[in-house]
Amino acid sequence: MIQEVPPSPPDARIEQDFQRDVWCLFGLPVDNLTLEGTKHLLRERVKLPYNTVLSTINVNWVVQSFADPAFRAAIINSDIVTLDGKPLLWLAKLLGYPMTETVAGSTLIQELHQDKTTDTKLSIFLFGGEDDAAAQAAKEINKNPGGLYAVGSLNPGFGTVEEMSSDVIIKTINQTRPDILLVALGAKKGTQWIERNRGRLEAKIISHLGATINFLAGKVQRAPLIVRRIGMEWAWRILQEPKLFPRYATDGLILLRVLVSRFLLWRKYLYLMTKTRNIPVDTSVSSCEGEQELRFSFGKNLRLTKDSSFPKLFLAFATSRKTITLSFKQTEFVDGAIAGLLLLLKKHQLKNKNSINYTQVHDKLNQIFTLLGFSK
């Protein structure tokens, strides 16, 4: 068993983070959630005294995260991250991850609105979009009563993130006290705006779902279900909006180049995963605690799928408020779930302005981290 680490009183948000079933994909923490599970989770989160940031990532988000550390950090700092698009789901399955379906933001909002059986309707504020799309989307939502009702909309026009973060804009949103704040400012600008203002916003769920406003407003027709099921929604979007073709082509080529460069690492990962599958999971940990630092040495085979006590250990790390030094001298294999926990730990160490160090990481383990996109 893992050696107990005396934790500090856990912050509720940190404790909640380490209860996630999260996996590292291209260096991003992706939650293993179904559409129904996500709907239920959001309905529970609106009851909490603090807000929740939801990110639904597609190929474009992944590609942008390669080159933009701030954008990557914004995704990592989200409280829920789901896969929006079949290509990412297929790639997750190639790594042996347990995800079974995508959770696209537009589908999620549509499903929440079409749920007319719920006793508790959720209020939604629409922020951004082109021209009058947000106002039109609000009208369409209220014209067809369901699980959502619109309490306001605002198009801030063109401007910087700072200009869109004025007291007047934040007050306009907050006075409606929405359960859901749907943001559509472009992926990078939208996530930056959320990162900057989440502490000032009184919305319970905050999410950048760019195209969703256009779908709700009826300005763009969503792909038929069969097209979405076979992973061809991107082709439908191009037919609807030809201006998207350059972006889709560029994103596809960049992702393909990354996949080709990591093909051999993927083969080695599958080999190591098979080779160590029947080896007992050694979760023994040796630790040394100082006044300002905690040092931990992990065992040989780190698999969350075979030992569910890891999240409790990582929670203790995150709530220690100390510098954390992790030694991987004996470690031969780390699964995507452990890498996901490492992402969360790094996030909270940075938020708490504490350091995290990784020592004695040998070549095989470095190759696994490179494949999964985990940056030390």
Task: Label every PLM stretch briefly.
Residues 87-92, 222-271:
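A transmembrane-helix-recognition feature enriched in membrane-embedded lipid enzymes
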Residues 125, 135-176, 183-215, 219-220, ...:
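Internal alpha/beta domain cores that form substrate/cofactor-binding pockets in large enzymes
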Residues 268-297:
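Short beta-strand/loop segment at the start of cytosolic alpha/beta domains
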Residues 58-62, 185-190, 212, 330-332:
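Short glycine-rich anion-binding loops that position phosphate/pyrophosphate groups of nucleotides
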Residues 75-140, 144:
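Portal/gating segments that form or line small-molecule/metal binding sites
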Residues 301-376:
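Amphipathic alpha-helical interaction surfaces in cytosolic regulatory modules
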Residues 84, 176-179, 293, 320-323:
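Short acidic/histidine-rich motifs immediately flanking catalytic phosphotransfer sites
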Residues 2-106:
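N-terminal nucleotide/polyanion-binding subdomain common to many enzyme families
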